[in-house]
């Protein structure tokens, strides 16, 4: 299988698992990063169960073939599957938007690893009034050409970061959970998704399973389990001052974190999900014990970004559609609005 991955940062984790399973991968990234990867490959560190140290996985040692390209050099129609691993605002870039249009026109199935679900995926949910959610997106227009049945979405649960001082081709997986993918609306695309999932399942290193699997779920709502985590943790790491860790966001006010977590889950239920689609707060809180760094959205805001993924605003808007609101969600949205407006003013 030929897999195209837009975004060489987070996408490298998914790409490494594809390479282990014998699939060929192209990472789409900036020219300097593409040059680095084409010359030296990628290096992902994953800790196997029962081991204290992370194990190194170099792309040059894996079964599949890896290359990296800039978006304008990609032949979109030559791939079996595209994986969307950039943050939502990045798709407004002209060369990326053009590549998206080419993927849509070539009817290439697209699997999102974004925190922000692509708009065509949301179109598959009858309860959502699309006109009322587009304002949460930085570039809603880039999704107009897609067939919704060929767009699916993952809960991007694995946590990865670039170790301090390392180059752009190195990633360390800090929380090795699974990608939970909703089924596509198209049967042929689901065959591809199942084949990819099953092939990744067979991967072994020193006789052991390698963490970070791809799990296909029948429910379209399965990836939305991540929403509660984002609202109770990630977006509450944004403060009026320096960002805090997910651990601190959850444990410094655990009762409030649980409230936000449960209210966000209620929004998913009212959209049509079931309790089986959600993750209990206790399981999330246990995972948060080891999440001792600020998440990317909080770091980006602190570093002056004038635009970030607005999952907080999307969830607030969907909650209002289904009659579920909470003061802490409103506070989060207002604070993020304020911080990015201040960043925009400073950048002007």
Q: How would you label these PLM feature ranges?
A:
Residues 29-80, 100:
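Conserved N-terminal Rossmann-fold NAD(P) cofactor-binding segment
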Residues 1-48, 119-120:
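NAD(P)+-binding Rossmann beta1-loop-alpha1 motif at the extreme N-terminus of oxidoreductases
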Residues 19-20, 104, 269, 320:
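Anion (oxyanion) recognition and catalysis
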Residues 15, 34, 96-101, 316:
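Short amphipathic alpha-helical segments and helix-helix/interface helices
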Residues 77, 111-227:
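Rossmann-fold dinucleotide-binding core
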Residues 166-170, 176-177, 198-205, 209-234, ...:
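NAD(P)-dependent Rossmann-like dehydrogenase/reductase catalytic/cofactor-binding core
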Residues 73-118:
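Rossmann-fold NAD(P) dinucleotide-binding segment
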Residues 92-99, 189-199, 260-261:
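Well-ordered, non-membrane alpha-helical segments in soluble/globular domains
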């Amino acid at each position: 299988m030929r897999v195209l991955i837009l975004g060489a940062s987070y996408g490298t984790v998914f790409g490494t698992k594809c390479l282990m399973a014998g699939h060929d991968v192209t990472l789409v990234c900036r020219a300097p990063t593409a040059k680095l990867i084409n010359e030296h490959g990628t290096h992902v560190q994953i800790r196997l169960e029962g081991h204290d140290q992370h194990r190194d996985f170099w792309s040059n040692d894996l079964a599949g073939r890896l290359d990296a390209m800039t978006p304008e050099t990609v032949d979109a129609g030559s791939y079996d599957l595209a994986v969307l691993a950039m943050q939502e605002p990045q798709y407004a870039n002209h060369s990326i938007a053009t590549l998206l249009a080419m993927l849509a026109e070539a009817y290439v199935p697209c699997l999102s690893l974004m925190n922000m679900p692509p708009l065509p995926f949301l179109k598959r949910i009858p309860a959502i009034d699309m006109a009322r959610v587009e304002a949460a997106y930085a570039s809603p227009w880039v999704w107009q050409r897609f067939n919704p049945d060929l767009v699916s979405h993952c809960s991007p649960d694995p946590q990865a970061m670039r170790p301090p001082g390392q180059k752009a081709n190195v990633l360390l997986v800090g929380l090795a959970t699974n990608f939970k993918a909703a089924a596509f609306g198209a049967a042929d695309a689901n065959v591809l998704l199942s084949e990819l999932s099953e092939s990744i399942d067979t991967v072994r290193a020193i006789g052991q399973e390698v963490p970070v699997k791809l799990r296909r779920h029948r429910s379209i709502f399965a990836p939305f389990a991540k929403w509660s985590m984002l609202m109770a943790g990630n977006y509450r790491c944004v403060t009026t001052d320096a960002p805090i860790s997910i651990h601190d966001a959850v444990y410094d006010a655990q009762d409030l974190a649980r409230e936000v977590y449960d209210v966000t889950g209620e929004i998913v239920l009212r959209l049509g999900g079931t309790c089986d689609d959600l993750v209990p707060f206790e399981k999330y809180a246990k995972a948060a014990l080891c999440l001792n760094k600020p998440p990317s959205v909080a770091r980006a805001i602190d570093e002056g970004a004038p635009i970030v993924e607005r999952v907080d605003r999307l969830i607030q808007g969907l909650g209002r559609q289904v009659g579920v609101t909470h003061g802490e969600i409103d506070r989060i949205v207002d604070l993020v609005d304020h911080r990015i407006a201040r960043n925009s003013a400073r950048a002007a």
